Amino acid sequence: MTTYKDAGVDVEAGYEAVRLMRNDVKRTFRPEVLTDIGGFGGLFGLNKDKYSEPVLVSGTDGVGTKLKIAFLLDKHDTVGIDCVAMCVNDIVCSGAEPLFFLDYIALGKNRPEKVAQIVKGIADGCVEAGCALIGGETAEMPGFYPEDEYDLAGFAVGIVEKSKIIDGSKIKAGDKLIGLASSGIHSNGYSLVRKILAPTAKKLAEEIKMLGTTLGEELIKPTRLYVKTILDLKEKFEIKGIAHITGGGFIENIPRMLPQGLGVKVVRGSWPVLPIFTLLKDLGNLDEMDMYNTFNMGIGMTIAVDAEIANSVVEYLNKDKEQAYIIGEVVSDKEGLEIC
């Protein structure tokens, strides 16, 4: 008799994975969570009395080919942080507080301990972002993915008062652009990274002097979460626009927050470019503009504020929360982005 397990799908392994992840999932729960693990849908009680006109904000993203680094390192407990960060950093650009998160893990073979490590990272990211992990799917897909590989994606939902949505509409010429430091490459550009470095397990274990760590540790660094910083900052200062520097780097993402007819001049040298980007540029013989069109270059998020408060915002951020820099200015003479 042929069984589902004979076809490569181990239902019992799925049950074991759920058992192992249970405590991590439950530590993300907020009081609004109305379900336990294992339901068909995650229930979340929206406290709409806190808002006059509540607006839900959603976002979805994945970790991309950074996962190939995790496979080589056999390290799976931080890529979940990347997954959460990619989603919640997007929705906080609208000023939204993340409420809950769902994950999707597709893999060639369900190894419960590995799945539990992935979910631990997701839970760590959710705790840092203040959102609840209320659902997920682990899909074992033999013959579709290699046994030791998986893909990881997530979905976040947040809320913002309609009158407090940050949409860039108030940005004007003369406003300053503030950059918040990244932790490293984050989760974009890894196809180019892998082409340049051709990483192997042996290469990833090598100590790189200019990085101050091994290549593997540098490449696997989790994406920085900016949620608590932005939610705190917007209660104290008027933030006119926010751009999450992801795929497309500076050149694609910063103009997305600008009203039509405006552009940005970014001042080269106004923040420290991280050594990993210098290494990639040198080894790959990359054009500088290609770098700015692919990587975050050491700045993971940018915010636009009135020029009169820019120094105060930077000073506030640098007290103990972030490394922040005034990196440019909004202009009216040219649309798009210029590095000068």
From Swiss-Prot:
Gene it is expressed from: purM
Compartments (UniProt record): Cytoplasm
Gene3D superfamilies (alphabetical): PurM-like C-terminal domain (3.90.650.10), PurM-like, N-terminal domain (3.30.1330.10)
GO aspect biological process, one term: 'de novo' IMP biosynthetic process
Organism field: Acetivibrio thermocellus (strain ATCC 27405 / DSM 1237 / JCM 9322 / NBRC 103400 / NCIMB 10682 / NRRL B-4536 / VPI 7372)
Biological classification of the source: Bacteria, Bacillati, Bacillota, Clostridia, Eubacteriales
Any Pfam family the entry gives: AIRS_C
Protein's recorded name: Phosphoribosylformylglycinamidine cyclo-ligase
Principal subcellular localization: cytoplasm
Keywords: ATP-binding, Cytoplasm, Ligase, Nucleotide-binding, Purine biosynthesis
